[in-house]
Amino acid sequence: NISIDDIIKSISSDYRLVHRLDKDTSGLLIVAKNLYTAKIFGKLFKSSLIQKTYIALCEGQPKQKESDVLLDIKNKKDKIEKTKTHYKLLAVQNNISLIQYKPLTGKTHQLRIVSKKLGCSIIGDNKYNSHSKFNNEELKLNAFNLKFIFKDKNYEFFSELSKDFNDFLKKYKFKDLKRYTLVKF
């Protein structure tokens, strides 16, 4: 198995991965060119000064169109960690929801657990949605947008969705993703 860290180190031993995505989540990652910059970005993440937005396709739909979800999640050491996630339902087709998530904390599997709690697990999530009719699908969770200020300059990046994600959107008759309004904070 080759990891993102392995790929980055093959390009330059100075490069550092600043944060992580859950396995099988697609989308944006920040890679620093050196340890000094990695530490700066680490502090920005800890201070919640980097805004992350995810897009997910989920089986079912949440009861509310938009809300904050506060959850206690066990970490790998069985310690409870508090999480906060804002979500907005963007569209529903054939009982499949297109949901935008903004995690205000960054814990392992946070969005996947939140989705399950909302009653609409992410398509392709075999860990938290093992009885789905979509078990053979790739995980439909994408780190879609990153926004931050660095050296007094605003930065914003958008991810392209994978072919598989786009094909699924088309198959279930979702409109072009650019038509949906992103949550502003």
Residue ranges of predicted features:
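RNA pseudouridine synthases
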Residues: 1-185
